[in-house]
Amino acid sequence: MTTAPSGLPGTPLPPARRRERPRWPLLVAGAAVLGLIGYMVLGNANSNLVYYVLPSEYQQDTAKFAGKTLRMGGLAKDVVYNRDTLALKFNMTDGQVAYPVQYQGAVPDMFRNDAVVVMEGQMQQGVFHGKSLLVKHSEEYKAADSKGEGQYSQDDLKKILNDQSTKP
């Protein structure tokens, strides 16, 4: 049995007091962790950005995109695909400028001549070497002209390429 300091038997001890810790170190540590996470997310965002351009926009400022991975979007023209080797070659155009494209891999079912495509890759010696291929489509039907080719203006292309609601 414990006794009080006065020595009287049966007198309970007063409840132990906890030493109250200041809360500001915890708040400072939490703010530092949040700041570090924010810096890591936003600081690395620029290095992970992939630029999206049309062929004519690329031609206007080739030095800006030199050596960088970018997304180029436009119409696929003069498509040549070898199913045995999975080698794809075509010209990507926005109606003003065309660049030859090379891609190695499976091609989506919707890919065809005059399809609106987005390629991610790099330009090397005037040829765009794609790493990934995306076929975009408009939600609106656009009839082919008398030559059997789709008619897209540069504004139509931008609208289709920037439309995030369409599935690749």
Swiss-Prot record:
Coiled coil: none
Membrane topology: Single-pass type II membrane protein
Cell membrane among keywords: yes
Localization per Swiss-Prot or TrEMBL: Cell membrane
Pfam family, one: CcmE
Reported function: Heme chaperone required for the biogenesis of c-type cytochromes. Transiently binds heme delivered by CcmC and transfers the heme to apo-cytochromes in a process facilitated by CcmF and CcmH.
Record protein name field: Cytochrome c-type biogenesis protein CcmE
Source organism per UniProt: Deinococcus radiodurans (strain ATCC 13939 / DSM 20539 / JCM 16871 / CCUG 27074 / LMG 4051 / NBRC 15346 / NCIMB 9279 / VKM B-1422 / R1)
Lineage of the organism: Bacteria, Thermotogati, Deinococcota, Deinococci, Deinococcales
